[in-house]
Swiss-Prot record:
The gene is rpsR. It holds the Pfam family Ribosomal_S18. It comes from Listeria monocytogenes serovar 1/2a (strain ATCC BAA-679 / EGD-e). One of its GO terms (biological process) is translation. The keyword Nucleus does not apply. Belongs to the bacterial ribosomal protein bS18 family. It comes from the Bacteria. Binds as a heterodimer with protein bS6 to the central domain of the 16S rRNA, where it helps stabilize the platform of the 30S subunit. PROSITE patterns: RIBOSOMAL_S18. This is Small ribosomal subunit protein bS18. InterPro entries: Ribosomal_bS18, Ribosomal_bS18_CS, Ribosomal_bS18_sf. Part of the 30S ribosomal subunit. Forms a tight heterodimer with protein bS6. GO terms for molecular function: small ribosomal subunit rRNA binding; structural constituent of ribosome.
Length: 79
């Protein structure tokens, strides 16, 4: 069995922003942005988070803007 998938159907991910009625993603809302950044500091892709394409673009801009303003780190801190 070389790399076959097991199990049934996966649950469809729902966009966090459309389900909560959020229309504007603010770059100063660091707690919200941290949910969409990995522990290494990378922006999580749509297939992981389930966000729609529209909000993924807005989210990416907000995270990059937040990094430029030094609110979010570019990379994770070493332990």
């Amino acid at each position: 069995m070389a790399g076959g998938r097991r199990g049934g159907r996966r649950r469809k991910k729902v966009c966090y922003f459309t389900s909560n009625g959020i229309t504007h993603i603010d770059y100063k809302d660091v707690e919200l942005l941290k949910k969409f950044v990995s522990e290494r500091g990378k922006i999580l892709p749509r297939r992981v988070t389930g966000t729609s394409a529209k909000y993924q673009r807005k989210l990416t801009v907000a995270i990059k803007r937040s990094r430029q303003m030094a609110l979010l780190p570019f990379v994770a801190e070493e332990k």
